[in-house]
Curated annotation (Swiss-Prot):
Belongs to the TRAFAC class translation factor GTPase superfamily. Classic translation factor GTPase family. EF-G/EF-2 subfamily. It comes from Ruegeria sp. (strain TM1040). One of its GO terms (biological process) is ribosome disassembly. This is Elongation factor G. It holds the Pfam family EFG_C.
Length: 706
């Protein structure tokens, strides 16, 4: 079967936003207007629409399902324009900082993005975080200023904030008409027409009329700015415009705006209200006009599996004739199908029944069921092509971030790095009979989310959940209850401390055991040195002349590794150090791998104490947004939490305070902040780095864990 949709008609894009900007409403409206069974012009009464939404939720295919495929034809004047139908793959990205890891992996598979802003709040902290991530992946994007019906909505202030906060050049291509409860529609600056939504059909139909006299001057001014940005993309257009005042025609203008968006020269901006059903169709038109198809994206460069240097010299692009390659970017549990692996196909064709290679893990996988997720149903498919985003059921060894490829032409496309958890809680089922169910549920949640880990405490036997923040773990406990029907009790959150060393030492340890018959003997001499923060651990053997035979060196490494998981101070993992084995002694009869393992372990334990072992704690980057009158109290409170305030700046009519604060002092901060600011201040925090714990606190922690 040949490809049904040419690649130039594909748009793989994500919707990204701060937590309350109205992203979900936006996504739902997009699905509603593009819904296959509810095309524009045949939307039934509200009840049917809501039924469709409910059924969508019942089936678990709301827009939250990683990727949704839907279709859109450019529309003008309430009618379909004479452009072909485009295929939209919408990838959802969460809005909360505890889930920046989710955003990171979505951005790895997007071609473009729509950033949704709240017209009142503008560019918020999480918007900036996501924007920076999108910059890193060089994702072309446009902005939809949502909630123009809200009190205090200010479109032009949002345009200014985009430029101030992100450094991008914002170019409005559609300006809202009215604001708050007088929002009527928008002016399309490209065609210079008003789009007005009237009537009670949930925004499905609208009219285009000439711009009213009272708005002409403003429209001309902003159109001029838009054209200036557009003609910079083409020397001839620039010359015609500057010398003769000749404005480009509509088609040329759109292609110049597209060129500027794709080259990240500027960001097109539109406004509207998804909730009031105004402005969503022009947004969809703009996605088609300005965001990239898979053909507009540069080649994806990968490396050969097993190449330790990771030299990226293997190219893959959206071409059906190339060898198959794809990236698994999200795992979801579906009540009807089991585990679904959402995969972006970068090159080639994938058929049902194919055997493929998971090149990240070096494991073979067989393709069983393949599905296309539509807004209101899932479609079983036999084959998929470059540019598609599909769900694969029944993959055994594949997790988030793995590359899938043709075994004959292997490539690793992406190495996603997942941060270590910074917070942990003990969890147990309320009824003993649920223990098995809880273990299975946690294992499935951990398979979906690489930043979440589950471990068993060897001493207490407790199950420990580890994650990126309190909210992250709260939501996972809630999912245990909702999806796996397990009620759980959770302990107080604990900080994930680490241990390291202060300076280099040389240490020798001799292990001797004689108790009749053959004994045990091993001697090791090691140099233990600190490394730069974040460098991790490395081992090298500098043995010459066979003072420790080769076959015993794995025993030495094993002994060192056993100490890494449980440091000498309080039993926390040890990070950022290196060990060199420089000398040793052995006995022809009494030496063994086990004897050298014990010698290395004891040498490490004694050597680390000599090397000034110290405790490290996670430091969080905290941003508080507060009305000015509460600033003094909030700064004082952060300082009392051992925080270091690094700056403050005006943010709209509020103040933004930046600080670095130890995680240990941030538990339950939300409640303190609410009471200090009468509920008006808000904060976000994310992991920054590890720092040494002050001596007096370190002693308390050691006593607690001794």
């Amino acid at each position: 079967m040949a490809r049904e949709y040419p690649l130039e008609l594909y748009r793989n894009f994500g919707i990204m936003a701060h937590i309350d900007a109205g992203k979900t409403t936006c996504s739902e409206r997009i699905l509603f207007y593009t819904g296959k069974s509810h095309n524009i012009g045949e939307v039934h009464d509200g009840a049917a629409t809501m039924d469709w939404m409910e059924q969508e939720q019942e089936r678990g295919i709301t827009i939250t399902s990683a990727a949704t495929t839907t279709f859109w034809e450019r529309t003008e004047d309430g009618e379909t324009a004479d452009t072909p139908k485009h295929r939209l793959n919408i990838i959802d990205t969460p809005g909360h900082v505890d889930f920046t890891i989710e955003v990171e992996r979505s951005l790895a598979v997007l071609d473009g993005a729509v950033c949704v802003l709240d017209a009142n709040a503008g560019v918020e902290p999480q918007t900036e975080t996501v924007w920076r991530q999108a910059d890193r992946y060089k994702v072309p994007r446009m902005v939809f200023v949502n909630k123009m019906d809200k009190i205090g909505a200010d479109f032009f202030n949002c345009v200014r904030m985009i430029e101030d906060r992100t450094g991008a050049r914002a170019v409005p291509v559609g300006i809202p008409i009215g604001a708050e409860n007088e929002l009527e529609g928008l002016i399309d600056l490209v065609t210079m027409k008003e789009w007005l939504w009237q009537g009670e059909d949930l925004g499905a139909s609208w009219v285009q009329v000439d711009i009213r006299d009272s708005l002409k001057e403003m429209a001309e001014e902003w159109r001029g700015k838009m054209i200036e940005a557009a003609v910079e993309m083409d020397d001839d257009a620039m010359e015609n415009y500057l010398m003769d005042g000749a404005e480009p025609d509509v088609a040329t203008l759109r292609s110049l705006l597209r060129k500027g968006t794709l080259s990240l020269s500027f960001v097109p901006v539109l406004g509207g209200s998804a909730f009031k059903n105004k402005g969503v169709q022009p947004l969809l038109n703009a996605v088609i006009d300005y965001l990239p198809s898979p053909l507009d994206v540069v080649d994806y460069m990968g490396f050969k599996p097993g190449d330790e240097e990771e030299v990226r010299n293997i190219a893959r692009r959206a071409d059906d004739d190339m060898a198959f390659s794809g990236l698994a970017f999200k795992i979801m549990n579906d009540p009807f199908v089991g585990s679904l692996t959402f995969t972006r196909i970068y090159s080639g064709v994938l058929n049902k029944g194919d055997s493929i290679l998971n090149s990240t893990k070096g494991k073979k996988e067989r393709i069983g069921r393949m599905m296309m997720m539509h807004s209101n149903n899932r479609e079983e498919i036999e084959e998929a092509f470059a540019g598609d985003i599909i769900a694969l059921a029944g993959l055994k060894d594949t997790t988030t971030g793995d590359t899938l490829c043709d075994a004959k032409e292997p490539v690793v496309l992406e190495t996603m790095t997942f941060p270590d958890p910074v917070i942990e809680i003990a969890v147990e089922p309320k009824t003993k009979g649920d223990q098995e169910k809880m273990s299975q549920g946690l294992a499935r949640l951990a398979a979906e989310d690489p930043s979440f880990r589950v471990e068993t405490d060897l001493e207490s036997g407790q199950t420990i959940m580890k994650g990126m923040g309190e909210l992250h773990l709260d939501i996972l406990v809630d999912r245990l209850k909702r999806e796996f029907k397990v009620e759980a009790n959770i302990g107080a959150p604990q900080v994930a401390y680490r241990e390291t060393i202060g300076h280099e030492v040389e240490h020798t340890y001799t292990h001797k055991k004689q108790s009749g018959g053959s004994g045990q003997f091993a001697e090791v001499k090691m140099i233990i040195s600190p490394t730069e923060a974040g460098e991790g651990y490395s081992f090298e053997s500098r043995i010459v002349g066979g003072s420790v035979p080769k076959e015993y060196i794995p025993g030495v490494e094993k002994g060192i590794n056993s100490v890494m998981d449980s440091g000498p101070l309080a039993g926390f993992p040890v990070i950022d150090f290196k060990v060199a084995l420089i000398d040793g002694k052995f006995h022809d009869v009494d030496s063994s791998v086990l004897a050298f393992e014990i010698a290395a372990r004891m040498c490490m334990r004694e050597g680390m104490r000599k090397a000034g072992a110290k405790l490290l704690e996670p430091i969080m980057k905290v941003e508080v947004i507060t009305p000015e009158e509460y600033t003094g109290g909030i700064i004082g409170d952060l300082t009392s939490r051992r925080g270091q305030v690094s700056g403050q700046e005006p943010r709209g009519n509020a103040i933004a305070i930046d600080a670095n604060v130890p995680l240990a002092n941030m538990f339950g901060y939300i409640n303190t902040l609410r009471s200090m600011s009468s509920g008006r201040a808000q904060f976000t925090m994310q992991f920054s780095h590890y720092d040494p714990v002050p001596q007096n606190i370190s002693e308390e922690i050691q006593a607690k864990y001794a």
